[in-house]
A protein has these predicted regions:
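N-proximal low-complexity "stem/linker" segments adjacent to membrane-targeting elements
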Residues: 1-27
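Short, acidic, metal-binding catalytic loop of nucleotide-sugar glycosyltransferases
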Residues: 26-37
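Short beta-strand/loop segment that forms part of the nucleotide-sugar
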Residues: 36-47, 63-66
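Acidic helix N-cap motif at the loop->helix transition within catalytic regions
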Residues: 47-56, 97, 101
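Glycine-rich, basic loop-to-helix element that forms the pyrophosphate-binding segment
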Residues: 67-84
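Short aromatic/hydrophobic "clamp" motif used to bind/position activated sugar donors
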Residues: 89
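Conserved donor NDP-sugar-binding/catalytic core segment of glycosyltransferases
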Residues: 101-130
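Conserved nucleotide-sugar donor-binding catalytic segment
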Residues: 138-196
């Protein structure tokens, strides 16, 4: 059997996530992107067992910490980055989901510019929308921290981490990544994408 090196490693920090993790993994399984080119790293940060989630996707790797637990999402992401095999790292929280075209849309941008981020949607436990941006809304960098939701970029592995922990860490992590991006010019305003 030929082992395929993944193109994308998706890191999910896992803390008390038994009730939400299946939905997050399902959103990865529903990607239009080739599943054999995606690895999922569950970076565990509690004492719970998550082995049964391997039944949802053959490319799941479970990373159990060898030391201190409850270190926070930042440190859990850092541990995941260390073992990731993909050239691109995707970050997803255990209580978040991606639309089916997420990886197909963002990967070319991340490959070209080093990083890609998109707008977010917030759903409750039943999958009903609590918050979503209008389809025509132009999501810009200046909106970080002002809009509710998570911001989880696709980023080249060489630019990923290390991440601190703390309040508003999704925003802080994105800002830290943006500082590393070599391209800081705007593309035309009529474009579908904006580069900081």
């Amino acid at each position: 059997m030929k082992i395929i090196t993944p193109e994308i490693s998706v890191i999910i920090p896992v803390y008390k996530a038994q009730s939400t993790l299946e939905r997050a993994i399902s959103s990865i399984n529903n990607q239009l992107y080739d599943q054999d080119k995606i690895e999922i790293i569950l970076s565990v940060d509690d004492n719970s067992k998550y082995d049964h989630f391997k039944l949802l996707n053959k490319n799941i790797r479970i990373l159990n910490p060898s030391g201190k637990l409850r270190t926070g999402a930042g440190e859990a992401r850092n541990r995941g980055i260390k073992i990731a095999r993909g050239k691109i790292i995707g970050f997803l929280d255990a209580d978040d989901t991606w639309s089916s075209n997420y990886l197909c849309e963002l990967k070319p941008i991340a490959m070209r510019y080093g990083m890609a981020i998109t707008k977010t949607e917030i759903l409750n436990q039943n999958g009903n929308y609590l918050f979503t941006l209008d389809p025509g809304y132009n999501f810009e960098i200046k909106h970080f921290g002002l809009l509710p939701g998570s911001f989880h970029p696709l980023v080249l592995k060489k630019l990923a981490g290390p991440f601190p922990d703390g309040a508003s860490q999704d925003v802080i992590h994105c800002i830290n990544l943006l500082k590393k991006i070599p391209y800081r010019s705007k593309i035309p305003s009529h474009s579908k994408y904006q580069i900081w």
